[in-house]
Amino acid sequence: MHRIPSSSAALVVIGLLAAACSSTNEHAADLVFRGGTVWTGDSLQPEARAVAIRKDRIVYVGDENGVDSLIGASTRVVTLGNRLLMPGFVDTHVHPVSAGVQLGECNLADIATIERLREVVAECNARDPNASWIRGGGFALPLFAGGTPTAALLDSLVPGRPAFLSSADGHNGWANSRALAIAGITRDTRDPVNGVIVRDAQGNAVGTLRESAQELVQQHIPPHTREEMRVGLERAVRRANQLGITSWHEASATEEILRAYTDADSLGRLTVRTVVALHVNVDSGPEQVQGLAALRDRYARPMVRPVAAKIFADGVLEGGTAALLADYTDRPGFRGDLNLPPARFNAIARALDSAGFKIHVHAIGDRAIRASLDAIEQRHGSRRVSGGPRPMIVHIQLFDSTDIGRFASLGVVASWQALWAFRDTYMKELTEPRIGPTRARWQYPLATMARTGAIMAGGSDWFVSSLDPLQAIRVAVTRQSPDDSTDAPFFPEERVDVETMLKAYTLGGAMASDAEQELGTIAVGKLADVIVLSADLRKVSPYQVTRTPVVLTVLGGREVWRDSTAFK
């Protein structure tokens, strides 16, 4: 698991031609796309030349001649030209509220050097002298030796008040001495369950807190207000619409996060369909499911579906907290720990399934992936899950190859963060030294998984990494950096083609949402969630995928974003 900077490049200038037909027709469409390529994602009709939308539904998919009768005096007609119309993107693992809030705090994303990071933190400290805490995050762990930032460094940048900054992966926190003191962390403080206080040779905390140890400090930080969380979500929604994302899965929600969604929706500002995965406390048992069901029933509405529950099976490889089947290469005798014993995992999974929840599992290490599959299999047996919510396992970084085929046989959705499938500094400095070259081969085996027929979906894990689906698609196709075409491909035998990833981010995402009857393809009767890209991604060089931006996003027949120059 690692982080890639979010793209900040401006979208290229695009022109779309719009016209209105003067004919009258009481059955006229509100919006028609014609004169270009339509990639439907539907195997029964893969391509078309025209699409018509009335209200929030697609009413026509076919050739241009057939759409003429649906064009009336008030119909808006968009001529596609060389551009591509396709279904909207679905991001199956993202943290919109926390990401949006963090954009308004001390934002350390996209920082490539320790010198620049020092400058930005110092600027954050100077910007708001009245703040009781300096908080934010997004920093890359490889900026620090061993992925371990120190309180001494943060003290020099924020000397007079407590500071706590989260790493980009969200699994590591950086505290200054004032924050450690407020939390009461001393050499005598024990590591919490599923957490690590990184210490020096004398046993003193150095300033890095891993996994649940972060909560020792976080519980003392003033919580965000209800308005701050709603405003943060609205920031995230605007960015998502710009990138063509029309549906997403909120990856781990408390009741406060649920309120942010319903607050934004009540104001008409939630323009991304949302599946919410409620946070499961791994230290508690199946008795918590009744409370989760009550939250689901209280907050459910058409645009907000709290129908999933998130279980953290393990941590991350770069922090040494992922659960492995064999020893860490750099720590003989240590394999990492599951966040909950298999018996409890299985009991929670059974209770969630019985209550009608979709199971959404974070699993990084090969042992965590196996334990997750085992928990699903013990409920359903060694057969494909059918007739209920599809379970989904996300991240799925390191596999034992014998477990890859189980996703298809059990009907488990594989949610990839494909943007991580190349050799960046996380991989070279923090991951490969921990697992060695033999196991490294089985990281992110997209092509092998695709050949099994498993349902594959795409996700960003934003704010951990870029929200832009095009960056993830480019990496999946090249197994190289999204910003560099000269680096050696990372196990190139696991490359997939563009269409595989388009399906993952559309129909695969809809299936992960258990909504493929309404979303995921362009077909008559489905919701009109569609996007226009500046060119056909299947026909450009893989290295041009990230330079083929979304220029128009339509949600339920309503335009929610367009390039400012698109309609002149």
Q: Where does each model-flagged region fall?
A:
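Bacterial N-terminal signal peptides
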Residues: 8-19
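Divalent metal-binding segments
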Residues: 21-34, 39, 43-291, 307-368, ...
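Acidic (Asp/Glu)-rich catalytic clusters
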Residues: 265-268, 294-304, 407-409
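Ligand-binding beta-strand-loop-alpha-helix segment within the catalytic cores
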Residues: 413
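Glycine- and charge-enriched low-complexity intrinsically disordered segments
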Residues: 562-568
